[in-house]
């Protein structure tokens, strides 16, 4: 199938705008000469030449079209109709014939490998017990690694035979392992223990099996009667109880079904020589449920009972002898219980949703777990002592050469879509395997199970190699980082380095290689795991480094090949090529920071490593003598001393800053052009002949002042014309009106609430007028400025008159561009690096660069922080816990070290009350991060045998109200007779191993407050956990969750009494495990992502069907690269479900959303804020499908999770409670419904202000329930409130106001009728003739309509004519945007809210 997508160039693998800039016309494969619009899916236009690398999201053109993601996809159809051939498998059916079963049909696709059919058969209920077989077509054995399309004679209807093959030792082991996996398939212990990429999911507990089976539901009437709607007490609004146990409800499927008591390797292994020659491979020892002990031989022909006992070796077959090719068949013969239970178990296994059992790409750990019985398990025991990672033993040569695998996958061809998919899939797979291996190795290193390569040195200086991975500890070895902050710098360097590796991998330049890098924090230590450059261990570092510096800049070397390769990355990464002086005082050219080292491996590849300074330094945290920061920074108390001197700006900040500068550049050029035009007109009027001369004499005023101070954009900003300077130096004080400009025409924006992809547009420029297109539109010359800048960049500029060139030159100087003819901002990462010296002739450049860095630091505090706070105020950013808050900071390029500054900023806001939820999450994040810093050093002094005692003691000091916590030193389990004087294992610095026990709660809290002050510059007003809870409104269970997730602690799931003053909350039995916290690179599926963005864009333009097709295509591509489980697939499924719902396909919406919930639980965690969102969406679709009780259960689950994660006081809780209240109203539980709706009303009033439309809607919902209860007075009171808000906010004529007014009339009539009836009763007593009052339960349709409204989905039937008008209007606007002619049009803009399914 050929799917036409108008905005994805087939030939651009990783659409880097820089490519467009270089290739000029060639990017436009249809050969159109118009260079204006070769837009790729990310919406970069060819203007990128004027812009700068990846910030190519041309803000000036797109600030306005934020709502349609990919710029003007519509006109692009004519401009360059790129056709993308998407591999669409036309699947076909084959017949499979397995021994002992009927032939069955299997749907396959030509792209699949034979191996994938093997996997399917090993998973099917009737063939799952076979592992050692081949597939044969007409007697020919098929090659496992062949693609089906390459097999001759294989077609629709072919018969494939499953033929049993003889076993080898390897095959026998695989068989036993597979049988064990089948026996354990419903057992959640692997998920609790965080092994084999298993993780938890509880959706099925609430949805009672699959949600698709609507057909089996009872009729509406009976459905209502059978619902038990009352939630548990702790879920009701106002409940202060936060139990922990319901976090993991017991799944009835998990009652263990025992098939065998013991399955283990026999101690008679391996077979002696004479038995090998009889075909014996290994011996198994088994105890059946009936308590029969048997010994089994695995031979080349299969499995049989032998006559051995525990003490007597007798390998002859037992009598009667059964030889079975499969262990399951043999066990079914000898144990009836096994046969019965195994069959039931497999039935249950296949009934589970596949997403509950597919492995996740990276391990997810659970911070709570129940007490599980530790069962005998031979495979687990064997795995613990061999390095089985993935499939080592299947690969020749045993251990994997990680470096070779990682680099070879990068070298795969990427010319067309199928090749790119193959390449990205390979890269992703190797990365997830490498991350798993590195994690396991890092734990082995810290647990003391790996021999060091320099065992003679003290522990903290040791380095390790295990499984072809190099491990080093995060300590300052050999005073390498002494000048940069010692151990603190050594701890920060690996994460900086990892960010550098991420950045270079994303740019993906051919011929430039980075190391596989994983950073693991485990038991208080930071371990860096890296793949090994071939040959590096044989040479001294001095000999191998041919680019960069090994001593922070004292000696520096360079290499032309490296300069050439790094030059390609410099544009997207905004790195300026620069010269530094070496020890001989001669200049050396670099295109990276000096620490970045280039090494050519023995494999001839060019590697770069030590990328810790890929991004420029953050001057707010780097005091430099004699340097003044900008006033914005100084006002907030910067620069501040930081623990180390490696504080860098984030890549997101650099991109936002450059984008911000680009807008500025465009405005300045436009203003100058206008002034020139005005001057020209004047002089033309005076005398035509001198026009040219006069024009050049009357150089515009603004320009002269710009010229005077080209170095400092901040100073030049103030010299622009007044209207413009207002627009550029806006910071905190930007008024709310400016923001209204942004909310123009969101046609059906269906990104749900937390669409990660939509969020990427948010880090646009500064707060205030810079955001909206309208601000630019006041400057009439903008379109000319854009054309001018483009034409300059496109040619050598010879055809352009000098005046225009001067305009661009001035604008370039003013914004700090490194080029004089085009906009190009880059940073020199070596500025302010101690020990780095620059040649004298670059002094001017250095001065400019210093200023640019100061401006970037000022931009962070004066623009990005206020814009984050503004987004929180208008609820476009809704963090719920520490992780989502950190993500919100990072999206805008704000490092977490600014957390104190952000909190301070909120504290001083007039609208502080409306930010209370964010402030509370921020404080809890600050406290738990400080506690984590302390915990790290605390754990380093703890012996392995005292670990659980130490961890529980620390948690008591942190969270328990028990005043005199006493540590239990682990003297209880064993006391050694002689004091062993062995060298203590792995305690850097040795010292007293019981020092940890002397910590007290008050001392810990003192340390936390001083850490908060020292690290975050924030003064915490509390001396104990109870004061913190009291003052900041925190919850202890939330603090426990945050600290456990951050440090990897796993605790027993039970109810903890934190507030008891008589006994501590935690005992050492409550600490079940410590897991590693792992950071790694996340390789991306670039093509799928482009499809996804184009789909979003289409949807937002109102083309739902086209959008839906693109997103389905994206889903296929995501699955192709990531496999079935990934966080991006989750976002894709959610959007698809929403589209299905809007387009009226409710069952399909339900099915996709169910997958999204399961995936979110498995990949992000069962109580991650995203999972809570997914539960809410699923409940809505369940309700629409008539599954009322399920909808309620899901909403109650979401509410419980949210209470644990952030408590009740959060704007999102209002939405949740409105949903619950509406569903309860629908099932006629009026009193319960009111509790939730009134709570929603209170929260909405607090966070949106009493006059907001959300509050008006809340009043209306409450009024409806009161009406159903016949309490008309209360109903009237609420509806009146709502009416007043509507009247004041949208005016009398608006539909909402009219509806409210009608409803008021109706309520008044009802109230009067009721009063009349009551009077009648009072007057005539019981024999009054009463007209029966009409009590109506709300119809399901009306409840659903309200549910849609509060969830941001509004359906309004449109006639064909309306649709055409709407389309015409959308196109007209786009045309106007292109030509830059939209004037301030706010008065006239379409009220689209009422025309289409809108989702806000």
Curated annotation (Swiss-Prot):
Feature: compositional bias, Low complexity: 707-722
Domain of life assignment: Eukaryota
InterPro entries cross-referenced by the UniProt entry: CLU-central, CLU_dom, CLU_N, CLU_prot, GSKIP_dom_sf, TPR-like_helical_dom_sf
The keyword Translocase is annotated on this UniProt entry: no
Compartment(s) where it occurs, according to its Swiss-Prot or TrEMBL record: Cytoplasm
Each TPR repeat, start to end: 1088-1121, 1130-1163, 1172-1205, 1214-1247
Major site of localization recorded for this protein: cytoplasm
Segments of skewed composition (Polar residues): 727-741, 1377-1388
One Pfam family here: CLU_N
Domain Clu: 380-622
Molecular-function annotations in GO: mRNA binding
Gene Ontology annotations for the cellular component aspect, listed alphabetically: cytoplasm
Region annotation (Disordered) ranges: 1-39, 56-78, 212-243, 684-741, 1377-1400
Biased composition range(s): Basic and acidic residues: 56-69, 1390-1400
Keywords: Cytoplasm, Repeat, TPR repeat
Coiled coil location: none
Gene Ontology biological process terms in this record: intracellular distribution of mitochondria; mitochondrion organization
Primary role: mRNA-binding protein involved in proper cytoplasmic distribution of mitochondria.
Family: Belongs to the CLU family.
Protein name: Clustered mitochondria protein homolog
Organism: Danio rerio (Zebrafish)
